From Swiss-Prot:
The modification Phosphothreonine is found at residue 128. Ca(2+) 4 binds at residues 303, 309, 363, 365. Expressed in the brain (at protein level). Predominantly expressed in rostral, phylogenetically younger brain regions, and in some endocrine tissues. This is Synaptotagmin-1. Binds 3 Ca(2+) ions per subunit. The ions are bound to the C2 domains. The lineage of its organism: Eukaryota, Metazoa, Chordata, Craniata, Vertebrata. Ca(2+) 5 binds at residues 303, 363, 365, 371. It comes from Rattus norvegicus (Rat). Changing residue 302 to K: Fails to localize at nerve terminals. Ca(2+) 1 binds at residues 172, 178, 230-232. Its cofactor is Ca(2+).
Amino acid sequence: MVSASHPEALAAPVTTVATLVPHNATEPASPGEGKEDAFSKLKQKFMNELHKIPLPPWALIAIAIVAVLLVVTCCFCVCKKCLFKKKNKKKGKEKGGKNAINMKDVKDLGKTMKDQALKDDDAETGLTDGEEKEEPKEEEKLGKLQYSLDYDFQNNQLLVGIIQAAELPALDMGGTSDPYVKVFLLPDKKKKFETKVHRKTLNPVFNEQFTFKVPYSELGGKTLVMAVYDFDRFSKHDIIGEFKVPMNTVDFGHVTEEWRDLQSAEKEEQEKLGDICFSLRYVPTAGKLTVVILEAKNLKKMDVGGLSDPYVKIHLMQNGKRLKKKKTTIKKNTLNPYYNESFSFEVPFEQIQKVQVVVTVLDYDKIGKNDAIGKVFVGYNSTGAELRHWSDMLANPRRPIAQWHTLQVEEEVDAMLAVKK
């Protein structure tokens, strides 16, 4: 009866309970549910920011992939470096620090060992430092030269044959030499002969013969000198070796042919006059010969103060006659003048092998006569380095060929020019 007459009253508590239960359940929310809410909010915020970026989705994905790859690569490199350092430290400990030796230590060690070895050698041989210095050095091998000698009694001529050389030392950077031979008689040095230069060889074959006009009655007082040189276009020619043959020791009843070892050359007693460098250029089509006086060096001192006032004269000659004359400016108070002055001569092609260019270096004097320091000539009937220079010019038309020449005594050059008229 009671339940039937008050149905609302019975239902009310149930409703109240139903509404209270959820209310009470939200208050003690679990930690897991709070984290999920925070993550969802962060995710929602990230997505909102992502949508604001003005890039297509595929571009964003590509950027993300590249970033991940960079991070992974950096981590890999760091790990590898750490492992490598540990490995090296371990090896260093095992080897006792051998890797710490640098090149300086190695060189110092080598030097110490070398010094010690020398001391040990001295101890074994029983030689002191003083005794070792006094020990004669082994004679340097300079090669050898084959030559022949004969005398023509009918014409009063000494015939000298330069056949070949062998086992010459290498004086050039390439391990070879450019040898040639000078031949002359002492005490008269005025007449000298030279063979052709043989390029890049230590065993040249010359097969050249030279003739000296000497009466047999005077031959006994002469000494024949044969000297082997290494040719160098831009500096002084180096002498390899020489030997002397006194004529009073030779039996001219038959032809002499023999090998002789080259000896170290004696220092030349002749006074040094200096060297001059000039270039030659010939243009056959225009018939134009150009001589450029470049410079001179180590000239002889002519003035009281130990210097000179040098200038250069150039003569074009043919058959002993002076065809043209030119001269440079004067350089004051110097033994190493620089000129770089050019002079041209008209020489037809058919005459180029008949002319001579005579170059004379003089010391200028305001009051007295200008004294010649030295002289040289190239061209017709020249010999040695001068002939080679002239030949190189003719072999290379239109191209300037520069070369150094050793100045000679004026009287000697004039005598040669007079003979070769």
